From Swiss-Prot:
Domain of life: Eukaryota
Organism (species): Ailurus fulgens
GO molecular function, one term: NADH dehydrogenase (ubiquinone) activity
Quaternary assembly: Core subunit of respiratory chain NADH dehydrogenase (Complex I) which is composed of 45 different subunits.
Entry protein name: NADH-ubiquinone oxidoreductase chain 4L
The entry's keywords: Electron transport, Membrane, Mitochondrion, Mitochondrion inner membrane, NAD, Respiratory chain, Translocase, Transmembrane, Transmembrane helix, Transport, Ubiquinone
Transmembrane segments: 1-21, 29-49, 61-81
Lineage of origin: Eukaryota, Metazoa, Chordata, Craniata, Vertebrata
Length: 98
């Protein structure tokens, strides 16, 4: 396994640990999710290009589209929560609270 793969895997792992540690604020969670998606995109692209999988060359673009949709939905949710409650705490997203 080359150093590039190790670095990208470490970026994914650090983003995942950040998602587990900083899950109280919505903005921190969204940034960690974007880091995870970016590292997955780079890893998938490098793997497909190095192995010459021509049939699977569309998969990283589809992953990037899903990441953009996730970012747009996350930011719209962040704006809605911050306008309603004044903070970006994830606990405000619980619909079972009164």
């Amino acid at each position: 396994m080359s150093m590039v793969y190790i670095n990208i895997f470490l970026a994914f792992a650090i983003s995942f640990v950040g998602l587990l540690m900083y899950r109280s604020h919505l903005m921190s969670s969204l940034l960690c999710l974007e880091g995870m998606m970016l590292s997955l995109f780079v890893m998938l692209t490098i793997t497909i290009l190095s192995n010459h999988f021509t049939l699977a060359s569309m998969i990283p673009i589809i992953l990037l589209v899903f990441a953009a949709c996730e970012a747009a939905l996350g930011l719209s949710l962040l704006v809605m929560v911050s306008n309603t409650y004044g903070t970006d705490y994830v606990q405000n997203l619980n619909l079972l609270q009164c």
